[in-house]
Amino acid sequence: MCGLTYLCVNPTFLTMATFLNFTLKELCASDIAKKQNIDNFPSFTIAKNLEELTEKLLQPLRTAWNDPIRVNSGYRSKALNDAVKGVQNSVHQDGFAADLYPSNGKIDEFGMFVKDWVTKNNIAFDQLLFEQSGSSKWVHFSLYSSTGTQRRQIHNITVK
């Protein structure tokens, strides 16, 4: 399903997964990291976690949805997670979560689709959170919890 290209950066070898619809670059992109000059490049282990997240959740979801999905937030280094005021044990830091938004802008329809898709297809995951902050909405989708479990939690969350 994916091809791997190994990159040598500051003698650490990192994996670059190329899936049909997602890239490592996209999963690590952050405007806040750019603005605050925060290094948000993952280790080899975290890149492999992002690959697993993509292979098991993101790409199958994108294929089922059959329309582009934007990753608003994927991997976050500890410094970036602190900058965005993420929870201390956020699995974004481990490469096991992504905040998603459908490119067509139909976030409520997308949220219902994801909920139905995980239920009907018995998809293994940790959390499916429908998050909102003011008028902004997104879907948080994680593969594992910080303890490695898959709790299959589905919640609505208001972020302050």
Language model features with spans:
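Extracytoplasmic cell-surface/polysaccharide-interacting catalytic and binding patches
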Residues: Y6-R62, R151, H155-K160
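Catalytic cores and adjacent binding grooves of peptidoglycan-active enzymes
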Residues: T12, P102-K160
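Extended, low-complexity, intrinsically disordered C-terminal regulatory tails
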Residues: E55-K85
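Structural recognition of the beta-strand scaffold that forms the well-ordered cores
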Residues: R70-N72, A97-Y101, H140-S142
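Short beta-strand
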Residues: N72-S73, V91-H92, Q127-S133
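Single, functionally critical "micro-switch" positions that shape active/binding sites
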Residues: R76, V91, F141
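Acidic, His- and aromatic-enriched active-site or binding-groove loops in soluble protein domains
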Residues: Q88-E109
